[in-house]
C-alpha cells in the first residue's frame, strides 16, 4: 500500500499577513544586532584587586628584603647624616634591636647614659609618622638614640647591652614583632664606633650557632618618634604599669603595648 506523507507547508513572508510580516522583520533585525560585550577580557577577573606595597606578604613576614627607595619619592634629607648635636662632652649612638620601647628602657638603666630618645632612621621618606613606618613602605627602622658620657660608660658596654637585648640572628623579626622596622642594626657616628661594632660582632658570631644578620651602617637622619612613644615603658605604657628606669636596675623588661 502506498502511503503519502505530506510535507509541512513552507511559510514565507509573502504568505503572512502584513502585521505578521512586520513582526517577523523586527525579530530578524534584533537577531542581527551585535551582542553586548563585557568591558573585561575573558581571561581577566571582573573584580579589581588593589595591591599595595604594604601588603607584600613575604616582606611583612620577615622573609623579604627591606623596601627599596623610589627615586621619585626618596628624600636626600632622610638618607643624609644625623645633623643633631649631642651635649658638650657627650656622644651619640643609634641601635635597632626590635621594638624601641624595650630597647630604650634597657639603655635608660645604663650608668653613664644621659639621654635616650626613640625614633625612626635609615629610611628614605622625610618626616615619617609611626603609621607610615608601620606600613613597611618607608624603609625606616625603630631606633633608640643613646646619648652617653664616654668618660663614664664605654661604647663597648653599650654594645653588650645591644647583644643581650635581642636576637641578632633573626631577619626582620624579634619574637612576635615582625617586619623590616624591627631589624637588627648598629648605626655609628665615628670610625671608632664602627671598628668596635664590627669587632664585637665577630666575637658574638663565634658564640652563636646561627649567622648574625645585624647591619652596621653610618648613622643617618634621626626622626624623633611621637611623644607618647618616649620612655613608654617607664611611664607605664597602655597598661599603666611603670617599669623602673633606675640606673643599674636588672628587673626583667616586659615589652607590652
Swiss-Prot record:
**What Gene3D superfamilies would the database entry show?**
Peptide methionine sulphoxide reductase MsrA (3.30.1060.10)
Phosphoserine: modified positions: 244
- The EC class name is oxidoreductase
Enzyme Commission number(s) of this protein: 1.8.4.11
Q: What are the disulphide bonds in this sequence?
A: none
Annotated spans, Disordered? 61-88
Transcription listed as a keyword: no
An MF annotation (GO) of this entry: peptide-methionine (S)-S-oxide reductase activity
Q: Which reaction does it catalyse?
A: L-methionyl-[protein] + [thioredoxin]-disulfide + H2O = L-methionyl-(S)-S-oxide-[protein] + [thioredoxin]-dithiol; [thioredoxin]-disulfide + L-methionine + H2O = L-methionine (S)-S-oxide + [thioredoxin]-dithiol
Query: Could you tell me the keywords of this UniProt record?
Result: Oxidoreductase, Phosphoprotein
| InterPro entries documented for this protein | Met_Sox_Rdtase_MsrA_dom (IPR002569), Met_Sox_Rdtase_MsrA_sf (IPR036509), MsrA_MetSO_reductase (IPR050162)
User: What functional role does this protein have?
Assistant: Has an important function as a repair enzyme for proteins that have been inactivated by oxidation. Catalyzes the reversible oxidation-reduction of methionine sulfoxide in proteins to methionine.
To which protein family does this belong? Belongs to the MsrA Met sulfoxide reductase family.
Q: What is this protein called?
A: Peptide methionine sulfoxide reductase
Organism annotation:
Brassica napus
Q: Which gene encodes it?
A: PMSR
Amino acid at each position: 500500500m502506498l502511503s503519502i506523507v505530506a510535507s509541512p507547508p513552507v511559510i514565507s513572508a509573502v504568505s503572512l499577513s502584513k502585521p505578521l510580516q512586520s513582526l517577523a522583520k523586527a525579530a530578524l533585525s534584533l537577531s542581527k544586532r551585535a551582542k553586548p560585550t563585557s568591558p573585561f577580557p575573558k581571561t581577566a577577573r571582573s573584580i579589581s584587586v588593589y595591591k599595595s606595597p604594604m601588603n607584600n606578604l613575604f616582606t611583612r613576614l620577615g622573609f623579604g628584603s627591606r623596601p627599596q627607595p623610589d627615586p621619585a619619592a626618596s628624600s636626600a634629607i632622610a638618607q643624609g647624616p644625623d645633623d643633631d648635636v649631642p651635649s658638650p662632652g657627650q656622644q651619640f649612638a643609634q641601635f635597632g634591636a626590635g621594638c624601641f620601647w624595650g630597647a630604650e628602657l634597657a639603655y635608660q638603666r645604663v650608668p653613664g647614659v644621659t639621654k635616650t630618645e626613640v625614633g625612626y632612621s635609615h629610611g628614605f621618606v622625610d618626616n615619617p609618622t609611626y603609621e607610615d613606618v608601620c606600613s613597611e613602605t618607608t624603609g625606616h627602622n625603630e631606633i633608640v638614640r643613646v646619648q652617653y658620657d664616654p668618660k663614664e660608660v664605654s661604647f663597648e658596654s653599650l654594645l653588650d647591652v645591644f647583644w643581650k637585648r635581642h636576637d641578632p640572628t633573626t631577619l626582620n623579626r624579634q619574637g612576635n614583632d615582625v617586619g623590616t622596622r624591627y631589624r637588627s642594626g648598629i648605626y655609628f657616628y665615628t670610625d671608632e664606633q664602627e671598628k668596635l661594632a664590627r669587632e664585637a660582632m665577630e666575637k658574638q658570631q663565634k658564640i652563636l650557632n646561627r649567622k648574625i644578620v645585624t647591619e652596621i651602617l653610618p648613622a643617618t637622619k634621626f626622626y624623633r618618634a611621637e611623644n607618647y612613644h618616649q620612655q613608654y615603658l617607664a611611664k607605664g605604657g597602655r597598661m599603666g604599669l611603670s617599669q623602673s628606669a633606675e640606673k643599674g636596675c636588672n628587673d626583667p623588661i616586659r615589652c607590652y603595648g
